[in-house]
Amino acid sequence: NADKNIELKVKEIIDSKIAFDDSNGDKLFKKIIEVTNGNSQTVILDFDGIDLVNTAFLNNAIGRLFDKEVYNIEKNRVLIRNMDDTKKDLLKETISNAVKRYSDRVS
């Protein structure tokens, strides 16, 4: 079913309530790449049960999704669920840094 969203529970993928280092970020990133391979479905990242996140995790898990060489964010949109404002602020910062980093590289 092409219009069905893919939901990923972050806590299950990294097997922890603390999304805290780059290797856990890698795990989530790889999973996103895996589930979106060959389709154009939207991915929902559910942060339910995650107590802590840091930038190392977010850079690797989500920042790299803005690298057009490895991921097409226009084709596979990514939505975030169950994330409090503190974590969202960190995420926004991560995304704006990633967008800058990857767009600078292209030009």
Please annotate each region the language model reported.
Residues S103-S107:
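Extended, charge-rich low-complexity interaction segments
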Residues V10-V43, F47-V99:
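Amphipathic alpha-helical interaction surfaces in cytosolic regulatory modules
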